[in-house]
Amino acid sequence: MIIGIDFDGTINNMLETWIDWLNVRHGTTVKIEDVVEWELTKVFPTLSKKDLFAPLSDPDYWSAVTFKLDAVEVIKKLFDEGHEIYIVTSSSYKTLVPKFENCLFAYLPFLKKENVIITYNKSLINCDILFDDAEHNLINFKGIKVIFDALYNKNS
């Protein structure tokens, strides 16, 4: 089986780390429960977009991002069973090096760069199944769609 797995928010705790990172650096008090939609500018209204997105280019931030419970073990098991595993991300090119070096390949060293697909249009991906936390990434995908539950996608 060819399996596509979104990276941010699906298998890692990016959002939790991002909120903590911003709270410490900017004196804000946002909690994960406050994030009930995609637009983070609404929960951090006092921050500029530059300040809001700055952590995503910081290697130290990506070193602090952890993976969700059992994610590494499940992905490794699927890989060992012979499934083709692809990490499918719509990340900005500016964040790719720190994200991959300090997080993705640190947790999933059995994957190679050939197992990573970068695209803003996940409907182009030719996988049998796609796991994602964003409904808009699954809408036109032609295979089996699995949406990961999150506070920000409850109204999707």
Give residue spans per PLM region.
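Acidic, Mg2+-coordinating phosphoryl-transfer loop and its flanking beta/alpha structural elements
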Residues: 131-156
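Short, basic/glycine-rich phosphate-binding loops at helix/coil junctions
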Residues: 43-58, 82-85
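Active-site neighborhood of HAD-like aspartate-dependent phosphohydrolases
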Residues: 1-51
